[in-house]
Amino acid sequence: MSTTGPITNYYVDSLINHESGDVIAAARFSAPGSHPAGPRPTSLVPECGDYPSCSFAPKPPVFSSSWAPVHSQSSVVYHPYSHQPHLSTDSRYMRSWLEPISGAVPFHGYPGNGRHYGLKPDAFPDHRAGECLGTNGRTYTDYLYCSSTDMRDKTQQNAPSPESELLTSGKHKEEKPELDPNNPVANWIHARSTRKKRCPYTKYQTLELEKEFLFNMYLTRDRRYEVARVLNLTERQVKIWFQNRRMKMKKMNKEKGDSKDQ
């Protein structure tokens, strides 16, 4: 019976380990409010009935606190819990962003000897080319640290004067190239009409034509040629003028007849 001690220890340890594992698994996977399941019967109990009972102090559980229930998923593989090592407590790597700097920016309207809050040197950089501006050319920092009078002065300085606007508009007009009307490649919208400009008659020519019209409303070809030569006009111009004058006279006579009937 000298081998009873080691064999008993082996079987007792195996029984204790199985029971503790069942308790932990039941506490982990059981729903809240449900009764814990009893220990699972093992096949080793009947075989150990011949050995005397021994009392051993139970081993402390591996994990001090019970785990929260985990939703079981078929596609997730269970990994045993491993305690993460504590992070280094070196003070060089902690709260570096809260360290105050000597050149902290004071707020407008508060005394300069007050408490300075930790700010990075590039917290309020100067205006750069890619920085967004407001509608009136002021940045966000101008609203924070400038008074109303300073903002009004900056707005007046940034506002363009009417003289500068006139100069810029004149420059744009001068830079616009003029299209050559004789150039066939020019756009047809900007092309000028090929029709001859209207050449109004002078007062002397109009007076002489009116006198001739009073003597005779219709001119012969010889008389038309003579009038055109004297007035320095073409026969076609004299003919058109007489045609227009006859139409005008008919219109005037018609208006007079309508006014009399009324």
Swiss-Prot record:
Q: Give start and end residues of each DNA-binding region.
A: 194-253
Tell me which InterPro entries the record gives: Abd-B_homeobox_TF, HD, HD_metazoa, Homeobox_CS, Homeodomain-like_sf, Hox9_activation_N, HXA9/HXB9/HXC9
Localisation: Nucleus
The record lists the organism as Oryzias latipes
Q: Is Transcription one of the keywords UniProt gives this record?
A: yes
A Gene Ontology term for the protein's cellular component: nucleus
Q: Name one GO biological process term.
A: embryonic skeletal system morphogenesis
Q: Provide the alphabetized UniProt keywords.
A: Developmental protein, DNA-binding, Homeobox, Nucleus, Transcription, Transcription regulation
Q: Which family is this sequence assigned to?
A: Belongs to the Abd-B homeobox family.
Primary role:
Sequence-specific transcription factor which is part of a developmental regulatory system that provides cells with specific positional identities on the anterior-posterior axis.
GO terms of molecular function: DNA-binding transcription factor activity; DNA-binding transcription factor activity, RNA polymerase II-specific; RNA polymerase II cis-regulatory region sequence-specific DNA binding
Its taxonomic placement starts with: Eukaryota, Metazoa, Chordata, Craniata, Vertebrata
Segments of this protein annotated with the region Disordered: 152-185
Protein name, entry field: Homeobox protein Hox-C9
